[in-house]
Amino acid sequence: MKALSEIGTEQHWLERKRACLTNVYTDMTALIADSKAPKNVSLAAFRPKKIKKLVVAEDEREWKPEWLAQLKQLDMFTNGNSSGPRAPIEKIPYKFKYTFEDEHGRSSTMSIEDWEIGALYRNCIKRAGGDENTAIEKVRKKYETEFLTKKDITLFLGTTLKHHRSRHSNPFTIVGVFYPPRESQQALF
């Protein structure tokens, strides 16, 4: 894969907002309804009215055998230059979730499956010398304190084929967090 261009963060992420925020949901009931036929929406931008908190829950410390097998597959980004299966990354022993409300006050708690929160945790655990509590507090500081006070958050929600087809009451998880800086009121005039 070759990047053809880059969308910068100038002017409060204006170009990124134009690219990512053309059809933003604010109502979970409407989004879930649109996930069914005929629209079959499986990826959406969602702006919560309020993010209540970041939930950190303990998870398995080792990969399940079926996940481990998938992780060891050849890397599709090496253009055939790989010498064999890739080494699996270390499993993060925690699940990170946001609890938020939509425009009608409907509360949802969804897993954050974004690679960025995993990379943040790995960097924090390394800087904390392996201290998981310190690493979690640093993740919480970024995703709860900094993001919720200084950023204009939009969540990218996606479904898995399994959850989409089985018609879960809510088939979505958070697959990305879009966090441009919150604009001051002066910037609007």
Language model regions located:
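Nucleic-acid-binding small beta-barrel platforms of the OB/S1 family
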Residues: 4-189
